[in-house]
């Protein structure tokens, strides 16, 4: 029993002290266990010792209810590892700085001793060779320069890491010696054994851990990419701007409501792919404008020429033959004039293709709102006249100066035709003029290199246009057998009068003179007056019918009057069933456009 207990007691030894010391609380002589003489036995002492050892071992191995150990995330964190590495590097640099201080003090002491020995060697007789003295001087100069480079400041150490590493690594290669003295005092010239032995007396402990210090210098000072690869980053102060890869993948963030994608330069080929991830409202309009801008001028001309068609009241739609490139301009224009009818429509604007603007959806909405405001105001007032409409249109045009005046006037003209304030013949004639002007603009756009050659053609086209316009006006008026047809340079503008009218009063209004009236009767066949002002208004007032006003202005009709020009009025009387008076205005060498009649 005692043997087994003794073996067990020796196997379980206390961790807090040596096994054979029974002093203090381990002794049973001075505590409550010492009751009788049996407690003085060795077995009893060992038993108490074992119980106490187990008790204290349990206390020492007890764990806290709260886990205070280092979390796993800290050990796996890259940031924490970088911080620990930086702290370790700082400690190593501080230790290296202390070592440099020690080496500096040791080198100063050696420098004093070496300077004394050098002074003694320089006092030798002149018969000895001077090569050894020169070598000693060179070695001393190298030693002093190396001592100056060893500055204990951390900044100087941090900046000169690469240079010192070069010195340390290149030293053993040149001298093929493992001693630190040969590394420190590497000279350019040949070395003698005496000088090597002189400087090699320094103990090895003055420059410890040279290999470890070399590895520390070769490491980066921090784990930051901006510090490791600073040459790849031009300006670190600029803010970070994210970039998107040019891929067809759809971003998951585009499904969110308040997500705005990164902007980048859009190519025409990539715009259709980016349409799924694009959230801007103006994407469709930008795509449409980009497509139209890429089209060439020839494609635009062919596409727009195919849209220009002529409509007849009893004939079907016939497109203009502008698709062939071999046909000349005169043939196209003559053919267009032959096919033109009173209801000819043209879907062009009056601008050439090079300067014609492409309106986006937003601009079209602005023009639609402009027309909507005008129509709403007309409907609110109810009653209106031509003068009132003109004032209303001018006021709205002045209020919308950010829009183009030509397009607004075109829309107002269409609205006026729809309201019935302008006859359809005038609108059709205006469209004919628009079609001819478009042809002229297209010709001007295609004939820019041949400007000198086309000057004569422009005058011929103007004369041809005047002649065709005069023919259209004569065909629209009633004819008589005694009517004289005009020449290509002069034509007559007829004014129709009913048979029930008794007389016509013609008033000539000038800006500087008073009003002059003259009465035309059947007994007076013609009256000639000279025009002294540029703007002339002729008021034709019939006796029985409503008043009609014909205004011929310089801005609308293109009249450039002079004192030499004359106006002739003539009256023609026919049979009893066709009694009429025909007043013709003879205009010499002037371009005429359509003049609207206000009913």
From Swiss-Prot:
Where in or outside the cell is it found? Cytoplasm, Cytoskeleton, Cilium axoneme; Cytoplasm, Cytoskeleton, Cilium basal body; Cytoplasm, Cytoskeleton; Cell projection, Cilium, Photoreceptor outer segment
Its keywords, alphabetically, are: Cell projection, Cytoplasm, Cytoskeleton, Leber congenital amaurosis, Retinitis pigmentosa, Sensory transduction, Vision
Check the UniProt entry and state the signal peptide residues, or none: none
4Fe-4S as a keyword?
no
**Cysteine pairs bridged by disulfides in the record:** none
Q: A GO CC term?
A: ciliary basal body
Which stretches of sequence are listed as region Disordered?
A: 163-205
InterPro entries found in the cross-reference section? SPATA7
Point to the regions of Polar residues compositional bias.
166-175
A GO BP term, please?
microtubule cytoskeleton organization
Q: Which residues form a coiled coil?
A: none
Q: What does this protein do?
A: Involved in the maintenance of both rod and cone photoreceptor cells. It is required for recruitment and proper localization of RPGRIP1 to the photoreceptor connecting cilium (CC), as well as photoreceptor-specific localization of proximal CC proteins at the distal CC. Maintenance of protein localization at the photoreceptor-specific distal CC is essential for normal microtubule stability and to prevent photoreceptor degeneration.
Which disease? Answer: Leber congenital amaurosis 3: A severe dystrophy of the retina, typically becoming evident in the first years of life. Visual function is usually poor and often accompanied by nystagmus, sluggish or near-absent pupillary responses, photophobia, high hyperopia and keratoconus. Retinitis pigmentosa 94, variable age at onset, autosomal recessive: A form of retinitis pigmentosa, a retinal dystrophy belonging to the group of pigmentary retinopathies. Retinitis pigmentosa is characterized by retinal pigment deposits visible on fundus examination and primary loss of rod photoreceptor cells followed by secondary loss of cone photoreceptors. Patients typically have night vision blindness and loss of midperipheral visual field.
Q: Quaternary form? A: Found in a complex with CFAP410, NEK1 and SPATA7. Interacts with NEK1. Interacts with RPGRIP1. Interacts with RPGR. Interacts with NPHP4. Interacts with NPHP1. Interacts with AHI1.
Under what name is this protein listed? Spermatogenesis-associated protein 7
Q: Which gene encodes it?
A: SPATA7
